[in-house]
Amino acid sequence: MSLLRHSLQALPALCLCVLVLACIGACQSEAHEGTPSPPPEQKTRRWNLVQSRMKELLEPAVTRTRDRWQWLWNLSILRGFIQTYYDDHLRDLGPRTKTWLLESKDTLLNKTYSLCPRLLCTDKN
């Protein structure tokens, strides 16, 4: 069962790889040196075959995924999740970022002064 779960998780990446390979194969078959290029209508037919085959392969997976994740698209659930996430993580992001930047600057300056020879970095007060 674990193998099936992993294979379902890898399905989108696999579909993308198949699409890329199909496009590369279609492009390479047209790019052989020394062979005349097929007429434009044949190129269009090849590409339409690739598109229709990919649609045929991917449409059931996309439909199943959409049906499984339909609850996520319910606006009230999604809105509640986003509001909670904002309240928990993003509300005070500005002040936290400013504090972190100031602390980082101070730490970096302290490290720089500690590495600097005393003759070059002494205060001239």
UniProtKB/Swiss-Prot annotation:
It is found in: Secreted. This is Apolipoprotein C-IV. One of its GO terms (biological process) is positive regulation of triglyceride storage. Its main location: secreted. It comes from the Eukaryota. The keyword Metal-binding does not apply. May participate in lipoprotein metabolism. It comes from Ateles geoffroyi. The keyword Magnesium does not apply. GO terms for cellular component: high-density lipoprotein particle; very-low-density lipoprotein particle. Keywords: Lipid transport, Secreted, Signal, Transport. Belongs to the apolipoprotein C4 family. Transmembrane segments: none annotated. Residues 1-27 form the signal peptide.
